[in-house]
Structure formats: structure tokens, C-alpha cells
Regions:
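Long, charge-dense
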Residues: 87-127
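Buried hydrophobic positions in well-ordered alpha/beta secondary-structure cores of metabolic enzymes
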Residues: 75, 158-160, 198
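Charged, compositionally biased N-terminal leader segments and the immediate start
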Residues: 1-30
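Short glycine/serine/threonine-rich phosphate/pyrophosphate-binding segments
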Residues: 79-82, 138-144, 165-169, 191-195
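N-terminal glycine-rich anion-binding loops that anchor highly charged ligand groups
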Residues: 27-41
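A short, well-structured juxtamembrane/interface segment
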Residues: 50-65
Length: 213
């Protein structure tokens, strides 16, 4: 078929068919499968089928939080931009990123720390169900772990998929050591687009007829 004849929906549908075919009959728990496949769709990287880890009934907890009108906090404006605003609106949810907020920048300067750390501190003031989606800054995950240990914050879900070489693996393992529902990309891979893909996969399971794989 000529690409000009394919509507965006057809391209996406065919992409997911190819992903299913190339997974070779491999299966995943029903609530996790759409997440794994959407991350593969976003990255064209099948290694996520092995590296994505779901802890403490993470997918189920995430869907409950979204149905309850959760706030989704991201660590980058790129991840924020990638999360479906129509899907959030349907559920009465919202997504925020504090990284560019003047008060966060000022707090980071005063404490000699990063804006990612300061943004996690600010998140302690969020009321209602909270989902934290980290796709860039391992320092955000490390600070979040400290805040959870101190019982200053209790996310319904943490998406821990920062990418890079310094403190990334360690931060992800620190998250996995906590008793919090989490979706983590083990190893060095991840990124803001992966964080957004995970959130969209969860949202679409509720907002799209029949869900989305």
C-alpha cells in the first residue's frame, strides 16, 4: 500500500500488528501488555519486552489512580507534552511539570541541588492521587525515594525510566527496593518519550473503546 493511502490510525494499527508478530507469540499480563507494546512502538526497541518491570500490581494501581482523577507529575516538559491531554481530560486528570517554575529554580539554587530534586520536594504539596513519571533525571528518583522513606509523599505509581550513564541504574534499583507500585525500565535505557508512552498506554486502556495494545 502506498503511504499516501494509509491514515494515521491504520499506520498505528499495522505497527502494533507487526510488534505482536515479532514478539513471536510471547504473552504478558493483560494490563501490562499494552504498556510493553506501546513502549516498543515508541522506541522500535524490543529489549523493553524484557527490561520493563512492574511491581506491586503497578498497572492496576495506576488505572485506579487515573479513574480517581490523579495528578501526573513529570520531570521534563517533553514528557509532559507527550502525554495525551484529551485522555487526561476525559478522566478529570491533569499533568504538571515543575522544572521551569521560578520557585523550584530558586529552591534548587538555595539548596545547591538540582531542579529535579526541588521539583520532587514541591510535589509533596500535591493533593489527591499522584503518579510520578520520571524519564530523565535519576536525581528525581533518588529524592523521591528519600521522601517516601520519610513518609512525606506516597505516590499511587512511580514510572522510573530515566536514561543515561550516571546514577541511572542505581536510582532505578533504589526505586525497586521500595514498596511502591512502580513501572521501571531496568538498565540504562529509558527517556521522556518512554515515560509518556507508558502513561498513554495506561490512559488508553480506560479512554479508548476496548483499550489499546
Amino acid at each position: 500500500m502506498d503511504s499516501k493511502e494509509m491514515a494515521p490510525g491504520d499506520i498505528e494499527r499495522r505497527s502494533f500488528e507487526i510488534i505482536t508478530e515479532e514478539l513471536g507469540g510471547r504473552t504478558f499480563p493483560p494490563l501490562e501488555e499494552p504498556v510493553v507494546k506501546r513502549v516498543i512502538h515508541t522506541t522500535a526497541d524490543f529489549s523493553y519486552a524484557d527490561s520493563l518491570v512492574f511491581t506491586h500490581d503497578a498497572a492496576h494501581c495506576a488505572l485506579d489512580a487515573l479513574r480517581a482523577g490523579a495528578t501526573v507529575l513529570t520531570d521534563t516538559n517533553m514528557a509532559l507534552a507527550g502525554i495525551s491531554k484529551p485522555a487526561l481530560a476525559k478522566l478529570g486528570c491533569k499533568a504538571v511539570c515543575y522544572m521551569a517554575d521560578p520557585d523550584v529554580a530558586a529552591a534548587a539554587r538555595a539548596a545547591g541541588t538540582t531542579r529535579a530534586v526541588a521539583s520532587m520536594d514541591k510535589a509533596c504539596g500535591i493533593e489527591g492521587p499522584l503518579i510520578v513519571a520520571v524519564g530523565n533525571a535519576p536525581t528525581a528518583l533518588l529524592r523521591l525515594a528519600e521522601l517516601m522513606d520519610a513518609r512525606k509523599i506516597a505516590p499511587a505509581l512511580v514510572v522510573g525510566v530515566p536514561v543515561g550513564f550516571v546514577n541511572v541504574v542505581e536510582a532505578k534499583e533504589e526505586l525497586l527496593a521500595r514498596r511502591v507500585p512502580a513501572i521501571v525500565a531496568r538498565g540504562r535505557k529509558g527517556g521522556s518519550t518512554v515515560a509518556a508512552a507508558i502513561m498513554n498506554a495506561l490512559l488508553y486502556q480506560i479512554t479508548r473503546p476496548g483499550g489499546s495494545k
